[in-house]
Amino acid sequence: MKIKTKQITVTAIMLAICLVSQFFKNLSVYITGPIINAALILTVLYAGMACGIILSIITPVTSFFITGSPVMAAIPAMFPCIMIGNIILVVCVELLRKKCGKAAGFPVSIAIGAVLKAVFMGIAIALIILPTFLPAPMHKMLQVLQLQFSVTQLITAVIGGVYAVIIAAVLKKTSLAQAD
């Protein structure tokens, strides 16, 4: 696979947006989450699935380094699950947006991807990893963390998808949206 300059540029810009948004994660996951999900979706749309997958893998790591989550530090097994959740969203958008028809395909693929991402993370993280590996001093946070890694993931992915649909509509007439 040959990566083109446009793909590198789009991916770099989306990564920069993700990095800046991650500084606000301690304010609210409802600020950072939708921005990162929108960036993942837009990366797929304008740079391709491979670049979206790369960003899906990088963003959980950069988030940890920027915000330093004690839960992530205590349970490193969550990293691959978050990465896989992001990849599920990216792959759904890429594979389903064309299959569901030109007009409805993009939003439908986002909705399906958001649900599948939340279901995967809800099962893998909220129901398996957290109850099994959460250190005893953190057990009082279990219900909040389970909510954060299931329902909150659905909400932030859907909001990010709405942002992506709006941004893509605005960018539709630009050279960025034109096929190479």
Regions found by a protein language model. Name each.
Residues 1-180:
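Loop-helix junctions at membrane interfaces
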